[in-house]
C-alpha cells in the first residue's frame, strides 16, 4: 500500500501586541490568507481575560500562555480542517512558551512556541529546552521569536555565529 505524501503548513509571527482592534483584524485576515493548518504567534500582550480576542473564524482551537500583565504571551491556533487531539499542554506563568503534545492528522507531534526575552535570550531558550526535554521527541517543531540569530541569514552583520548558538541548532 502506497502512503500518500502529505504536508503540514505552520506559520509563525511575532505580533508585538494585539490590544488594538485594527491589529487583531489585520492578523485575522493574514491568518486566513495564508491557508495554513497551524498558526503560532508570539507577544500577544493579552491577559487571560482577553484571550477571547484571539478568535478567528475557522480556527476554534486556541491554546495560549499568558500572564497577568499585558506583556509577552504566546499562542498556538489550530485550523478546524486539522484533526488535532491534545495529550499534554505545558505553559509557563510568564507567557513565554507553550508546549503542545498530541496528534495532528493522526501523527504524534510536539509543538513548542517560544518568545524569549531580549535579555539573556540564548540562556533562556536553552533553559526552556532543558525544562521540556522529557516532552520533546523526534517529531518536535520549535518555533517562535528566540531573539537570537540561529544562522548567518538571520544576522544583519557579517559577524559569525558563536559556538553556543551553533550547538543550539543541533
Residue ranges and their predicted role:
Residues 1-170:
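A shared catalytic/ligand-binding motif for oxyanion handling
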